[in-house]
Regions:
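Mature catalytic core of soluble alpha/beta enzymes
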Residues: 1-176
Length: 176
């Protein structure tokens, strides 16, 4: 018999599956709502969302994209969404700094090191919250240039906020 348990030797080490778990949870709650006859809803788990149908005013659901600032919670852009999942990934909440360099919690799978590029935040609009969540993390790991290439190849709606000096520049994929 093979023991399938995951063990860790360092007490301070942990695995954080929020890069995919929140979007998956959003979709599961949406499935439950739909099975109960709801066809107009907005589900939000930790900023990952699924917007279906219309809001109470008969419009699409308005969602604010935060400015990637560790100190505040300002809205950078408002979008209106109907029948899509939305997820944002960024380096402005979970990071550390050493010798003036910011190190993100997102790891580059090629180097095994934290990402260090200028992409501060990426928001993905996709058919499901699971897809939006996973692609936001993947694009965040890739950086702005490769992330835009992937967004175009996959036909995704993606909004980028890239660090430029003391501020940010905005760009988006054609599908956004």
């Amino acid at each position: 018999k093979v023991d399938q348990a995951l063990r860790k030797s360092s007490p301070g080490l942990y695995v954080d599956l929020s890069a995919i778990a929140k979007g998956f949870g959003v979709d599961k709650v949406g499935e439950l709502l739909e099975s109960e006859g709801f066809n107009h809803y907005l589900v939000d788990i930790g900023g990952d969302m699924k917007a279906v149908g219309s809001n109470p005013d008969g419009q699409g659901w308005r969602i604010g994209i935060e400015r990637p600032d560790a100190e505040g919670r300002e809205i950078e852009k408002l979008i209106e969404v109907k029948n899509f999942g939305v997820a944002t990934s960024g380096d402005y909440r979970n990071y550390f700094e050493r010798d003036g360099q910011r190190y993100s919690h997102t790891i580059n799978s090629v180097t095994g090191r934290p990402i260090t590029h200028r992409l501060a935040s990426v928001t993905v609009v996709a058919p499901t919250a699971t897809e939006a969540d996973g692609m936001a993390t993947a694009i965040m790991a890739l950086g702005p240039e490769q992330g835009l290439k992937l967004a175009k190849e996959q036909g995704l709606g993606v909004f980028f906020l890239v660090r430029e000096g003391e501020g940010f520049s905005e760009s988006m994929s054609p599908g956004f």
